[in-house]
Amino acid sequence: MLKKTIDVSKKARYYMLGNPQSNISKVWFVLHGYAMLSEFFIQKFKNLDDGNTLIIAPEALNRFYINDYYSRVGASWMTKEERKTDIEENINYLNLLSKKIFEEIGHTNFKLNILGFSQGGATACRWIFASHMKIDSLVLWASDLPQDTLIEK
């Protein structure tokens, strides 16, 4: 048996609180945990929406049913299957999304903050390390630094 892959285009969804406009002084990317959806996760950050803050909740690219009744759906940033590919696709997705958001804001004079919850924390770390982006703060909520980001290069 021969395993092969093909690149495909996929729509990725994300939710925002606030509008990407010139008065933005703070940007938060908030990455949800395993089996969560960004639509609900972003609700936890409503109090940050002060007119000068933009909150973006990207949703992991892999959705699945989380119960036996097919009534609840969650999303996962990665599993052990094709893990490296999932990580690369997450980084590409987050890079494209952040570039789009920054262009919409129209300036770079804002504080960039990233919060990752659980599995989203590992994804946030990998994104930051792979992208070499400058951030003002990283918040890991119920998460650790992934071992593969601690390897000296």
At which residue positions do the language-model features occur?
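Gly/Ala-rich beta-loop-alpha elbow adjacent to hydrolase catalytic centers
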Residues: L115-G120, A124
